[in-house]
Amino acid sequence: MADRDRPHPHQIQVHPQHPHRYEGGVKSLLPQKGPSTTQILAIITLLPISGTLLCLAGITLVGTLIGLAVATPVFVIFSPVLVPAAILIAGAVTAFLTSGAFGLTGLSSLSWVLNSFRRATGQGPLEYAKRGVQEGTLYVGEKTKQAGEAIKSTAKEGGREGTART
């Protein structure tokens, strides 16, 4: 009966106690010590630089807006000339790029046709060179055989004459 009153070992829950769990409120989120001297020097150095860059960005924005305000009426006044000129220039650039693309297409087609003819005849540069080497080897072999037979026949004739003289 004593076992029923005591909790079983697998039902024991352990809750570790953290000493600074909820103490301090917002202060616990902040670091305990202040910034280091290198961090302070970095901030002191970067503040004027970032301020200068921000000022330059603002000046650039104002200059762009003023330029747009001045140029818009000029574009409206000269649009009967500028629009056809822009269309003409765009057409010329497109024609130039198209002619280059057609030239490359023609060259690649010609290369493909030549390669297909080479494959049809079976004589590519490598096959032609191999065949030439094989023919040269056969020619040298035949000439060597003929020279050996000539030496043999000369030796036989010399041997007959040597035996006839003695």
UniProtKB/Swiss-Prot annotation:
Please provide the record's keywords in A-Z order: Acetylation, Allergen, Lipid droplet, Membrane, Transmembrane, Transmembrane helix
Q: Which Pfam families match?
A: Oleosin
Q: Biological process (GO) annotations?
A: lipid droplet organization; lipid storage; response to freezing; seed maturation; seed oilbody biogenesis
Annotated Gene Ontology cellular component terms: membrane; monolayer-surrounded lipid storage body
Subcellular location per the Swiss-Prot or TrEMBL entry? Lipid droplet; Membrane
Looking up PROSITE patterns in the UniProt record yields: OLEOSINS (PS00811)
List the residue ranges of the region (Disordered): 1-27
**PTM sites of type N-acetylalanine:** A2
Tissues in which the UniProt entry reports expression: Expressed in seeds (at protein level).
Membrane spanning residue stretches: 40-60, 73-93, 94-114
Q: Which InterPro entries match?
A: Oleosin
Residues spanned by motif Proline-knot: 73-84
Topology term for the membrane: Multi-pass membrane protein
Q: What does this protein do?
A: May have a structural role to stabilize the lipid body during desiccation of the seed by preventing coalescence of the oil. Probably interacts with both lipid and phospholipid moieties of lipid bodies. May also provide recognition signals for specific lipase anchorage in lipolysis during seedling growth.
Domain notes for this protein:
The proline-knot motif may be involved in the targeting to oil bodies.
What is the similarity comment for this entry? Answer: Belongs to the oleosin family.
Stated name of the protein: Oleosin H1
Q: What species is this protein from? A: Sesamum indicum
